[in-house]
Amino acid sequence: MSKRLTPIHLPNSLNYPIEIASCLVPQGSYVKKGTPLLLYRFFTKVKEDQEDGSEVYVDREFVEQFECPVEGELVEWAVKKEESIENFSKIVAKLHEPCTHEVNYGGLCAICGKNITSQDYMGYSDMARANISMTHNTGDLTVSLEEASRLESENVKRLRQEKRLSLIVDLDQTIIHATVDPTVGEWMSDPGNVNYDVLRDVRSFNLQEGPSGYTSCYYIKFRPGLAQFLQKISELYELHIYTMGTKAYAKEVAKIIDPTGKLFQDRVLSRDDSGSLAQKSLRRLFPCDTSMVVVIDDRGDVWDWNPNLIKVVPYEFFVGIGDINSNFLAKSTPLPEQEQLIPLEIPKDEPDSVDEINEENEETPEYDSSNSSYAQDSSTIPEKTLLKDTFLQNREALEEQNKERVTALELQKSERPLAKQQNALLEDEGKPTPSHTLLHNRDHELERLEKVLKDIHAVYYEEENDISSRSGNHKHANVGLIIPKMKQKVLKGCRLLFSGVIPLGVDVLSSDIAKWAMSFGAEVVLDFSVPPTHLIAAKIRTEKVKKAVSMGNIKVVKLNWLTESLSQWKRLPESDYLLYPSYDLPDRNLSEHSYSSSSDDEQRISELNDRELDEIDWQAADQDVENALKDLSDDNDFDTGSISASQSQPEALEVNTPIKRKADLIQPSYNYDGEKRRKENDNHEGYDLLPNSSTKGEESAENENELDDLADIMEAELSKDTA
């Protein structure tokens, strides 16, 4: 067996180019660390004083010695006398070391026991040779690149023999959901509570939070089907836990989901040992070879959208709690809830709520985490700059964030958000029934995820067998290439435009939902200048929705068409997710008057919407108009409900329709044609929101007059408020 030799390089800090002046140690000699190995010369300009008192720069030759940075037998000189060396990449000698200190534990070589923390005057330290951490449960144990490569090669060989891959599993909102709200414990002990049945399989444990002795009771809900999922997938994958929770938290959760320790064993990595307080990296566990590693996580950003990642839909059982360990991470923006079509025609004699009648803006409001103050990414916890240094170098930062985390947990326990939400639900809906439960077991993500993981495993070993069958081929299949190839097929050819999905102030192409969609082959566009194939709409009344419907060749679908397609890794039929159940609207319903963004009437209404209709005092506006009309007519030509033309009437008030309230504002653009729909399809539940078909004749003219007059009144009111 040949000796493993250590190459010796000159420092990068030398004044290159240099010339070897002399080799001081004979080949075959044993040298100690710090022994002079060679002399080298170099030339540089120096300043010298002249006889006349002036100073000039002249070239001078200097000779220095280079000392051996390691201990061992000098097996081979790689340079000779008078040889010129241009940079530090040149190997000058090769030594055989008795110990290469490739495994470091707490500053000591784990092989020979030598202290390797010392550093010489050139900045060299044996600690730098073993700086790769690849174990799960401690950051104090590090290895060299060569040792890491050897260990991984052995692991890869074992997995291929077992026909398995490696699977990194996130905990919070991926396979479990956690809370410290004591309301859960009270509901679990009350058989009469409406949430009692869905809490039967919730587990709990007490955990001391840091050195303060503060204790929290955690309630853990398994994602439906978790036990079967882990058991089946463990036959195809070796399982690893990688969480941003604390080490104590990760161990307790691992005990609950794997009580025998058979599935995960000691392969549990927490943020305490991960080397980063805000990011996750495959290189932390697999520094040399990630070709057999798959990741499942509800957050793509913490992995920088690694090609080995399978992003799952976040599991939200405890409503509004979010990720209990996310205060270390950058804030994530939740997707908006899908706005539903209103099934009944609005009675004209009843006032409408703002949400029902006010046409929505194109984008969702800026995300305000204060609306979910019990989630760990809430405004009670300052957003942190991403920290990339190791835990050992950031103990103070870690301690500070742990204190903030404890503060957030205390807030969640004292505020009892689940109890507040359940009480609000019962107040809204009346007498408690099973349908009034706040918590629900309706998640099927693990079923879909199991199928995806099985498909990836099958494709990997199919490719691996194909490659190995070719003689002389030393390549192997790569999950990092297989997963993107499979994903790109799902939405290939789809150009997506979003409406009401991405909050204001968030760059569309940098948003999680856009990156997720693009990783599946979709193209994301910003407007209609590049015609989209799909409009993904979370809100039913936006300019983009109207324009897309009027164009006729764009599929206007709900947000869950996209999220479920991404979750299932297949393009689901759009017909099941159309924003309007009867999408193929007649051409007469898509008239320019109803939809065209260039329509003067619609433009004026849109402008008024942009100026916050909710701030208008409608009663005061009505009263002002009535007072103005009374002042203009001494003969009572006008009644209080409508205005008729008169020769003495100013041109600005020549209207012949009743004064409209805010509820009537959207009628020229949309109406609820429920009666007609019921006759067309008796089996159809609810009613469709249809464009107003009144585009010609007397009714159209009346509508146009209504819009003109209403716009004038509203603009006058806004001007008065502004003044």
From Swiss-Prot:
Its main location: nucleus. The active site is at 170, 172. Its cofactor is Mg(2+); Mn(2+); Co(2+). SUPFAM superfamilies: BRCT domain, HAD-like. GO terms for molecular function: metal ion binding; RNA polymerase II CTD heptapeptide repeat phosphatase activity. Keywords: Cobalt, Hydrolase, Magnesium, Manganese, Metal-binding, Nucleus, Protein phosphatase. Its EC number is 3.1.3.16. GO terms for biological process: signaling. Residues 673-687 have a biased composition (Basic and acidic residues). Residues 352-366, 700-715 have a biased composition (Acidic residues). Residues 345-380, 631-723 are annotated as: Disordered. Residues 639-650 have a biased composition (Polar residues). It comes from the Eukaryota. The keyword Flavoprotein does not apply. It is found in: Nucleus. Residues 160-341 form the FCP1 homology domain. Residues 486-579 form the BRCT domain. The keyword Metal-binding applies. It is an enzyme of class 3 (hydrolase). It catalyses: O-phospho-L-seryl-[protein] + H2O = L-seryl-[protein] + phosphate; O-phospho-L-threonyl-[protein] + H2O = L-threonyl-[protein] + phosphate. GO terms for cellular component: nucleus. Residues 367-379 have a biased composition (Low complexity). Processively dephosphorylates 'Ser-2' and 'Ser-5' of the heptad repeats YSPTSPS in the C-terminal domain of the largest RNA polymerase II subunit. This promotes the activity of RNA polymerase II. Monomer. NCBIfam families: FCP1_euk. This is RNA polymerase II subunit A C-terminal domain phosphatase. It comes from Schizosaccharomyces pombe (strain 972 / ATCC 24843).
